[in-house]
C-alpha cells in the first residue's frame, strides 16, 4: 500500500509537470532548453525511483505503465542522471518515440531542460543505443 501511495505521488507530480509545460506552450511561450544528445536506458521512472526496477525483466510492466499514462524516463547509467521525458506540444504522447524501446538503451536527440535539480528531455529522434 505504501508503494502504491509513492507511485501515485510520483505519477501525479509527473502529470502536473507535463501539464504545466503544455499550458506554457498554449500561451505562446517558447520553451527554453538546449539541443542535446543523451544515451541511456528507457525506464518507468515510478518503478525505478520507488523500487529500483529496471532492465529486461521489467519491460512488460514499464510498457503497461506507459500505456496507462506514465511518461518514460531516460536513465544515463554512466552517471545516474534520470531525465523525465516530456512532449513539446499539448495533448501529444511523450512516449510515442520510446514505446518500442522500453527498458533498452537508446540514444535520444532532443531538447534538454534543467530546473531545481530535475532534468527533462523532449525527444526529437531516438535510435537504439549501445
Question: Where is each model-derived feature located?
Answer:
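OB-fold (S1/OB) nucleic-acid-binding surfaces
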Residues: 57-85
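Bacterial N-terminal signal peptides
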Residues: 7-19
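Cleaved targeting-peptide boundary
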Residues: 20-32
Amino acid at each position: 500500500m505504501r508503494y502504491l501511495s509513492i507511485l501515485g505521488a510520483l505519477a501525479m507530480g509527473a502529470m502536473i509537470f507535463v501539464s504545466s509545460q503544455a499550458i506554457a506552450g498554449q500561451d505562446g511561450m517558447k520553451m527554453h532548453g538546449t539541443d542535446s544528445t543523451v544515451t541511456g536506458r528507457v525506464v518507468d521512472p515510478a518503478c525505478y525511483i520507488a523500487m529500483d526496477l529496471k532492465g529486461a525483466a521489467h519491460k512488460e510492466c514499464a510498457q503497461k505503465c506507459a500505456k496507462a499514462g506514465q511518461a518514460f524516463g531516460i536513465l544515463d547509467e554512466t552517471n545516474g542522471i534520470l531525465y523525465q521525458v516530456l512532449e513539446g506540444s499539448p495533448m501529444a504522447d511523450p512516449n510515442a518515440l520510446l514505446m518500442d524501446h522500453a527498458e533498452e538503451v537508446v540514444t535520444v536527440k532532443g531538447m534538454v531542460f534543467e530546473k531545481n535539480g530535475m532534468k527533462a528531455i523532449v525527444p526529437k529522434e531516438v535510435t537504439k543505443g549501445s
